[in-house]
């Protein structure tokens, strides 16, 4: 059994597959109907209008409807698109067992405990026929898939087949009056719309289920006598064919498989049994430990079954549908049915080669799993799971292609896997001894070789090499030298796909794709939410793969995207250009044409083939917000500008790429204050004073404008601004501008007009304006302020700018490949100076006669004018020199030695050497490459919030450098401090940088944290544990054992941080006793040291006991007693248990179930029970509810929840 989907719920009593979509309906004993997407594993909807258990449910074949019947005697018809019940059919007088739509007519058949079967017309919403005859509960009833028959099973120990041909004729409009009269009579006097055709007797006890065969005249039934019976019928009679025995309890449901000649039954003996319908023998049995099975459903089109049991349901397949295939150049060998087939890609010719299995061999779950081909010897190895793993070796005759009558005896053997490793050698895995047998084509053992790891499968990895798979890693093993060539930690690998040049390999797990080099050096990891099915490399080195419902691509750097969606899963065999060749589940070859433009464009960007990028921009229809976001994310905003029409997005991209001209054009179109402000900030950063001035004018930001005029020495406009402030009656602005201008008289005048006569007098006196000072003194009279004597006053004048006007000089760089396209696409980016002046003057009542440096039009035109100088020397600014003719230039002799001193070239700084050689974040930070360190931590651990690490980065950098002071006129000499330095060290070999953090420090902090926890200093303990979590990414250890210890420390500290956060939260919530109890309860489920767990249990027991939740307190008390507490604690716990046994109740209901295993969400502090979806922090592994995905982890305060990360890298031994 291959379980595809499983749910946990109340007992499932009814199941129905949707005929087209990957949906299944499950009706529960609790009265809820669940609609699941079994492919994605998600609950789509739930319907809960029934009162009591719902035992029957069924999808309509073509309409968006389903029907349900329950113990409330009601049949409800639902529209799942509108999420509501359309109507209810009433008529049954007891529990309804099953309901089913007719495949063609608007009928529903229902079986009930009122001993009747009813047929309803769901369009007219009436009962059209009542089938009576059973004298006990009718357990099931169903329509025949093609004929006018109904089969029913009852506890009266019979199976009945009913003929409803008359009902069909009655439903079809009568052709003449005689027929109409007959129908009227039957309506008046009780007609015979349905008659019993056969009564099948043979079961000794009540029959629970009966079902028709989809195509043959067969019926299968299951009963409380633990037997499954097979019946055959013809036009006149029906008889028992055989009885299938094996179930140990009541058979609850039995079905024919839709595609295979088998019968599937389930029973209250907790088993599902699979029977051969032809031989009537048991093939397989699947058991559950605690759950009885109640219902089966078979998908009408696909190889899927579903079974409902006491605690949920499972969707499963009986055998794999992936065809075994092997690629060889332009051809494909694959196994289908009983033949090995050959497919040629160039001609798309498909032919049979040889039979590979004798007819009549049981084929269930024994189809070929893998296929390996040797082109030189024309030999094929086919592996299957038969007998615990076996292989068959066939030598294909050269003239057998196209013929299928060449029968040969295959050479067989047992082994977990078998693959060709050389021209005439193949390797077979012996799982029991974990060794490989190398055999020749005569199936003789040539060599035995033990494997370096416990291996459960082997794959081809080049001539003489094997890729060995264990549960958590893969290794490449050289059989000749018996050496491990590469090793990589991976999830459980299912398939291995090598590129055509054998330089790259894709390792496919259930939900992960790992791209690595031929030596298993990790290149990128990709995670998928739904199952990965297959993959192949295209000609450009892009990995194309399929999931259950998509064809996707993966670039060499790990970027991925969707190429197209799929209706059914496919298995890619080859990618050639824009064509994907694949096999479907029926073993048919298909060629699918795809649009590869998107990933080729991204690949060209990645490989910096900008000529291709430019060509694709001009010729392709690349568009969409996703492409713009990708280009922006990858640092190509200037490319993204080509795809954007929206002015706001263009403005943002232009600012990001520093393209001021496009930004001005977009800001003019948008004309909003915020955009002008941001434009001013960017223009100021670039030193473009003209644009800065223009932006400040548009936002009427006079303070910034006056300061700009001050620092650029534009005193004329500064004086105009002062007049504007005077007109606007802005005293402070007027005074500021006067101060900037150094205009003392104006300042005295402003102070006098503002009524500050003492200040005006002091200003005039200090600056030597005696006439004005005397006049003001007269006005002040006796209130003249006294000035200090003996001080020599100096005039406060603003400094004169050294460089007045002009933009900052910018380095001239080569014109970017993408700039030409932008300039040619003129978007009206120039701003008319007359318009600017008009707005400026109208608003400020003053005429500004142009900008000093250059107007906007000149600015935008200058760049184009400068770039049009395309003569060879124009860009260099070289001039022709007129030299006097009498000065001959002397020629230097060949052996003349120059007396000019040549400075030796500067060597590489040590920090740069460290940065280039290391891939550890701590060493990058010590070298001063903070940006690289942050990128590494983001890629390895998903860290995004680097604020807690800032001080540590600086400590690492300072700790690895020392500075020697020389003469006062000389700069200090920096010295690099290396790790493990000694006097015998070679001066030319650089060791890694010395690090201020090591693992022993963390051990000391951990002990301090334990001590603080024990003494109840939770805030201090939390600080210490968080400090450990923040330090671990920047610690370097030497051995693999120490790496494991570091990873173990992360888990330990994470548990304490989460627990302490909950405890501190609990202490804050004094007004919410229920939440206090919940948080105390969750704290006890953190993985703590025994003394701390004991204290947490004691605390939770006390809180719950005080709240009179005695049952919950009793649970904590029992757990406390299991930890061997001290006498006083044990005595208290026993007293709580005794008190609870007298009254085992809880006064308040808590969101806490100690019987159901759970983890606690690190953000919301609610339990996530086993089976519920969650997301985790890639660094500290704390678990969260799904809606927290994308937020910063609240436990470690570093990583992004749910982010993809390759894992902690803290040792050079992990890199080797």
From Swiss-Prot:
It comes from the Eukaryota. One of its GO terms (molecular function) is structural molecule activity. This is Coatomer subunit alpha-1. It comes from Arabidopsis thaliana. It is found in: Cytoplasm; Golgi apparatus membrane; Cytoplasmic vesicle, COPI-coated vesicle membrane. Its main location: cytoplasm. Keywords: Cytoplasm, Cytoplasmic vesicle, ER-Golgi transport, Golgi apparatus, Membrane, Protein transport, Repeat, Transport, WD repeat. Oligomeric complex that consists of at least the alpha, beta, beta', gamma, delta, epsilon and zeta subunits.
